[in-house]
Amino acid sequence: MSFMEALKDLRSEIDSLDRELIQLFAKRLELVSQVGKVKHQHGLPIYAPEREIAMLQARRLEAEKAGISADLIEDVLRRFMRESYANENQFGFKTINSDIHKIVIVGGYGKLGGLFARYLRASGYPISILDREDWAVAESILANADVVIVSVPINLTLETIERLKPYLTENMLLADLTSVKREPLAKMLEVHTGAVLGLHPMFGADIASMAKQVVVRCDGRFPERYEWLLEQIQIWGAKIYQTNATEHDHNMTYIQALRHFSTFANGLHLSKQPINLANLLALSSPIYRLELAMIGRLFAQDAELYADIIMDKSENLAVIETLKQTYDEALTFFENNDRQGFIDAFHKVRDWFGDYSEQFLKESRQLLQQANDLKQG
């Protein structure tokens, strides 16, 4: 037998095993769907962290005993779990508050508003949408609403909340999904005498599942009246993080405004350079390709949204100005050929990150491996 024939036979066996794997995958997903039905019936969150950790630890040990890479098995299982979380959505979720007969989402045809509309419908709540062309009939849309959720662009949020004022009754819950919280929360408390809740989903509308996602909670008024909504969101798999509006907005200056500005500036700078993007990609290491992907991803989205996030408040500009100063400071190391100064600064930053440095190194290594797997050619 020639080596090509031997290779063909081995590949044929591998193909056969792959087909068996597909059947096993299908069986596992079917079992997961049954789990989803049970969770739906009993109102259990789709994400159970303790179960996930215990299962992964057990499978890693079993893999090592079998002489298989534990990381390989964990990678496969995590991909399965991600698929499983998305599949569990199709069975819907338990209705936490059966006394809620009408929820109105202002801006519910938008991306994020539409996402919450789908999840709330899947949880058994009747949903009505008030869109920008509907204000002439706002009274009828908002009549008898139990909950009103505002999900509009940042620059329209305060105006929209003000326009709702004539239609709000004390028994209603008024909430918003805006990525800034201090001014919207204050405006809701001003126009409404009933329950008020500020929410900030820390994810985009393109997620496949809310499992492991974070939703920030900023209390407004009468929290006992909206605990059911927070519990509902947790059943979807999300984690609720509680903070106050001022602290939230301060943190968002760094999490959103500074990061988005830096990404925008990097993209703007690259676009002005005498380079060919295709050539950069062909020569890229996995980490640089991932960085390029993060930059390019920004420019595939809504420019108005990012303009609003970056320009939202004066604190953002002040912090961005300090970034400019830090760039100038860092540049002096190289202008002065100050190698030791650079090394000293490097070590100071490493000390600031502390143990997170090693944690981020491990996490980024996994991301880079996945990014390299997706590389074409």
UniProtKB/Swiss-Prot annotation:
One of its GO terms (biological process) is tyrosine biosynthetic process. It is found in: Cytoplasm. It catalyses: chorismate = prephenate; prephenate + NAD(+) = 3-(4-hydroxyphenyl)pyruvate + CO2 + NADH. Pathway: Amino-acid biosynthesis; L-tyrosine biosynthesis; (4-hydroxyphenyl)pyruvate from prephenate (NAD(+) route): step 1/1; Metabolic intermediate biosynthesis; prephenate biosynthesis; prephenate from chorismate: step 1/1. Its EC number is 5.4.99.5, 1.3.1.12. InterPro entries: 6-PGluconate_DH-like_C_sf (IPR008927), Chor_mut/prephenate_DH_T (IPR008244), Chorismate_II_sf (IPR036263), CM_dom_sf (IPR036979), CM_II_prokaryot (IPR002701), CM_T (IPR011277), NAD(P)-bd_dom_sf (IPR036291), PDH_C (IPR046825). Its main location: cytoplasm. Residues 1-92 form the Chorismate mutase domain. PANTHER family: PREPHENATE DEHYDROGENASE, PREPHENATE DEHYDROGENASE [NADP(+)]. In the C-terminal section; belongs to the prephenate/arogenate dehydrogenase family. This is T-protein. It comes from Haemophilus influenzae (strain ATCC 51907 / DSM 11121 / KW20 / Rd). The gene is tyrA.
